[in-house]
Amino acid sequence: MAQTLSFNGRRRVRKFFGKIPEVAEMPNLIEVQKASYDQFLMVEEPKGGRPDEGLQAVFKSVFPITDFSGASMLEFVSYEFEPPKFDVDECRQRDLTYAAPLKVTLRLIVFDIDEDTGAKSIKDIKEQSVYMGDMPLMTNNGTFIVNGTERVIVSQMHRSPGVFFDHDKGKSHSSGKLLFAARVIPYRGSWLDIEFDAKDIVYARIDRRRKIPVTSLLMALGMDGEEILDTFYTKSLYKRDGEGWRIPFKPETLKGAKAITEMVDADTGEVVVEAGKKLTPRLLRTLSDKGLKALKAADDDLYGNYLAGDIVNYSTGEIYLEAGDEIDEKTLGIILANGFDEIPVLGIDHINVGAYIRNTLTADKNENRQDALFDIYRVMRPGEPPTMESAEAMFNSLFFDAERYDLSAVGRVKMNMRLDLTVEDTVRILRKDDILAVVRMLVELRDGKGEIDDIDNLGNRRVRSVGELMENQYRLGLLRMERAIKERMSSIEIDTVMPQDLINAKPAAAAVREFFGSSQLSQFMDQVNPLSEITHKRRLSALGPGGLTRERAGFEVRDVHPTHYGRICPIETPEGPNIGLINSLATFARVNKYGFIESPYRRIVDGKVTSDVLYLSAMEEAKYYVAQANAEMNADGSFVDEFVVCRHAGEVMLAPRDSMNLMDVSPKQVVSVAAALIPFLENDDANRALMGSNMQRQAVPLLRAEAPFVGTGMEPVVARDSGAAIGARRGGVVDQVDATRIVIRATEDLEAGKSGVDIYRLQKFQRSNQNTCVNQRPLVTVGDEVNRGDILADGPSTDLGDLALGRNALVAFMPWNGYNYEDSILLSERIVADDVFTSIHIEEFEVMARDTKLGPEEITRDIPNVSEEALKNLDEAGIVYIGAEVQPGDILVGKITPKGESPMTPEEKLLRAIFGEKASDVRDTSMRMPPGTYGTIVEVRVFNRHGVEKDERAMAIEREEIERLAKDRDDEQAILDRNVYGRLIEMLRGQASIAGPKGFKKGSELSNAVVSEYPRSQWWMFAVEDEKVQSELEALRGQYDESKSRLEQRFMDKVEKVQRGDEMPPGVMKMVKVFVAVKRKIQPGDKMAGRHGNKGVVSRIVPVEDMPFLEDGTHVDVVLNPLGVPSRMNVGQILETHLGWACAGMGRQIGELIEAYKANGNIEPLRKTIGDVVGDGPKAEQVHEFDDDSVLRLADQWKRGVSIATPVFDGANEADVNDMLRLAGLKDSGQSTLYDGRTGEQFDRQVTVGYIYMLKLNHLVDDKIHARSIGPYSLVTQQPLGGKAQFGGQRFGEMEVWALEAYGAAYTLQEMLTVKSDDVAGRTKVYEAIVRGDDTFEAGIPESFNVLVKEMRSLGLSVELENTKLDEAQAAQLPDAAE
């Protein structure tokens, strides 16, 4: 019999519809974050020291620091991290930052300086390790914990350093002429722009300042006019020949021209080209072949050319004409008169080569290097008088000083590629040759050669990940520190000082704190569900420091670019002002060492596709022909079609199969993780797919997670990489399981000194950043064998290791009494009764007892004027019990605050002295439940300041925690003992002993029975003859003792932390945190959605018996509006409905077969049915080889509905859907007859019914509904505040006022504008009137009117209100009364 495969039932098996085999492994989805930060910190120093990158590079760039006189120097040696004080969970609980102390070893060198010669000799060297603040560490999930909350540092997209050529698209000048410009962007330092103006003069700008002619810049680099012309133009020599001139024949400059006069060969005198003839390339080639070397020219043919060198009389030194002068009658006369018969001429023909640099040189007022340097100095530092030294130093510091200017390796690589240079990427400053190459290329662009750059190409944009952002921030901190160190080194007696006396690490620590706390890229992690966590970590933002701003970003930056293919998702981006500026990394993409995004491709060798995978960036990919992942192939890997659809240089085209070099790895490499989770994405309109991707991130984890029937195969990947489901770190056997932890005895990776036990703590009812509930449930049972990577426990929104954001619901597409108008959703009461869409939310309330001026606040049960009934949930310490059910207004923590003393009468003083304290000294400031929240207390934490006596509740919590730690220690100890003593007895068995415990007969052979007579602790006393075994025994003993002491030490450390007081904000004596779990059932007003952007609000919940039902009596759960599909073009939801219907139909069949098996014991029909469903695709499970137990486990998993995977762009097609429906015994129209639940009548026509995966989104009506009668008012305007958080009112705005004005509702309007809003006196009067039962009131002046008057007065306008009373006769004479 074939070897049976077993299936443990701990993972979900899916029927796979994908036809394209996946050759590349999908990289870990949060690798972007982890790899970047690891490279920055390099915690473990490698052998041979750390390379110059990350933190090491920062220290190397700032150190050594020399004092102003050069008498001492502070050098950097190395750095190391100490273990963090608190682990991740402790930091979360205590609101601390998870960080490790950074220790830097510095060396202070003091020199002796010889006063006469200035020679230095080393006088003293001191080395010391200095504490440089705490460096935040990344958790295993790629997040940081800052002040107790999880944060994510989002990667930033910015323009890559390097050189860019561009033009203004004809916008600057009215003629629409294209003005070309080049810009050299360094990583840090001054920007250099070189640009044309409308007159074709070339200018340079430094740091966007005033422009100077580019020739001045070149002169400042040490060139003179003639050298500049030599660099940019070719020279030719015109010789005098009789009356005319002999000029060289250069065919390359004459292409396409027309001969105005006849062309004569200077050597033979024959006419080679007639006047008026066009010079075709063929004709020019013929002339060259004939041996034409030079042409004859008259004087006027020379006019308009430019001299290539000075015309000098060498005997007298007189310069007649300078290089660059134009040749005309006058200048030619001077040349001939002085007897020159050879003229050097610049090769400028105004067609292929323009005279731009020559014209600039002529227009430039600066003659030499000094003038040019002074000019640049005046531009950069206006108002300062320049000297040669200061100008030279300033110019050098701009581009040629590594401290001030850094192109970075990326910039140098980009520059080399663009300008065809070959310079090492360690050369990080500009060179003269670089500037010349930039100017040369710019001039060539103006001459019509070459292309401008596309700045939105991903080859020109790079990603700055956490590590790099942190590196820049830390460098800023160190530079601030450097100034202070220099000053201190100069002002202090250096001989007696140690390095730590010079260093104040506060600026560096502050820079780090500022970055994590308030940078735009450090964001509060989106933790609604595992998918939102992963997407947040893979996000790319173009905003942030050094990036774009929303207002300035145009359409081009936001648009999808051809280079996004396989790198950035074209679908997932927010709707709204940030659209296109915040993107998501594609599934297979990764970031290379230079920060460019790379995508994987399969190599094609000799026309055959191999499994060899190659990662390329956008720049490298442009030169290849890349076939699509779904191109049809033969079995040997060659293409079926003669012409293949491919991409090349940003275009999609058909090309012959022989020209293909690469092929895409997978169809889903185009999209991001969220988009890859949408089945039938290819059938959805892009706008709706965008909404679908974004809404999956808002799905609330439900009470019972259920994986989708119709998935895409990405679900386990997301669950695993997000860290929501717990995977085994190494193989082993499950030793213990309960709801809070799993203990596994490892069977692999057993190194000496490494614990042989893995304890996995499960999170129970923890609060996430968005108040959703994080809860993990074990999937394994005692005795299970697990392999590395197996799923041990499900987390929030996961089901058997698959991401499960919602529930499968039976949906009918039909109208129902108008309750699904405008995308509303009609639900059955069954969904509420069975808690299908019920979720748990956890609210955190904290209360602090402070030390006030009038005395300390106190947390107590003894609260004045509160009934015993209100205190029923509090313990003797005044803190609510765990498990108490609370509702709005209930006290959670009782607290009293001392009241300000009012002066006392002598009688009161006497009474006080006699009867002691009076209850009126304190007021009740207890924490109560806010309005509208009901729930159950799930956790209470009490924090005490050092030295403050702990109350009974704090002690109880502490005892519980210590018991838990002791249990962990004891379990690990028990497994260790079992392992070690097991190995010990194995070693001793059959050995001849030479010593043993008291009363043992030496020399006898040891056996299990003999050894077992003695207590375990005495087994170590046995010694054996065999020396090898004896030494192994001793090694085992050493290892055992070491492990045991390590365990005990770890336990003691943890206990010490628990017992120690907590660090509190100043003035706080005690803090209590209370966590309340709120169960939210679905109700009208909650927002729901499918995965295809089909969102809606629940409009009504109908009794089950009134819902439409199928022929077998099953009532549908959800009724959706069929009109929501056609105009939105998200047909994927209909295909999902059909396929889900087929899955449920097959699940029903499998359920029936299970019942049959229970009756007759024959499992083969079940095995055959499941085998037929799974099929035989590339990823199909071998069900026919499963043992019987495994078949039953799989059948049990599938009886509610078969799970299938239809990957994006490679999923089930129409035929597959029809086959599945037939296999399930259903109609292939996918429609069913429905009956009205209220009348029992059949509906007129067939209705599409099936299963859709529905999500409940984090927009719950409970969080939004809000009512106010009286509440807080704004300080200045005295108007009610707005919003639920402020307990605000409803704004009656400008337009609403217009509406009342239009109706002439004067009294209503008056109320709205005065007593209901900001008439302070009127408000109280109305209240008093209502209390009296009187309904008359008088409106006064609104406060906002006073604000207006004050504002006008502040502008110098005296505004007075006249208070005059008129009688009726006077009133009648007013102008508007007469009309």
UniProtKB/Swiss-Prot annotation:
Pfam families attached to this UniProt entry: RNA_pol_Rpb2_1 (PF04563), RNA_pol_Rpb2_2 (PF04561), RNA_pol_Rpb2_3 (PF04565), RNA_pol_Rpb2_45 (PF10385), RNA_pol_Rpb2_6 (PF00562), RNA_pol_Rpb2_7 (PF04560)
A cellular component term, taken from the record's GO annotations: DNA-directed RNA polymerase complex
GO terms, molecular function: DNA binding; DNA-directed RNA polymerase activity; ribonucleoside binding
Top EC group: transferase
GO biological process: DNA-templated transcription
Record's catalysed reaction(s): RNA(n) + a ribonucleoside 5'-triphosphate = RNA(n+1) + diphosphate
Keywords noted in UniProt: DNA-directed RNA polymerase, Nucleotidyltransferase, Transcription, Transferase
UniProt xrefs under InterPro entries: DNA-dir_RNA_pol_bsu_ext_1_sf (IPR042107), DNA-dir_RNA_pol_bsu_external_1 (IPR019462), DNA-dir_RNA_pol_su2 (IPR015712), DNA-dir_RNAP_su2_dom (IPR007120), DNA-dir_RNAP_su2_hyb_sf (IPR037033), RNA_pol_bsu_bac (IPR010243), RNA_pol_bsu_CS (IPR007121), RNA_pol_bsu_protrusion (IPR007644)
EC numbers: 2.7.7.6
NCBIfam families: PRK00405.1, rpoB
Family, per entry: Belongs to the RNA polymerase beta chain family.
Role noted for this protein: DNA-dependent RNA polymerase catalyzes the transcription of DNA into RNA using the four ribonucleoside triphosphates as substrates.
Quaternary structure (record): The RNAP catalytic core consists of 2 alpha, 1 beta, 1 beta' and 1 omega subunit. When a sigma factor is associated with the core the holoenzyme is formed, which can initiate transcription.
Protein name, entry field: DNA-directed RNA polymerase subunit beta
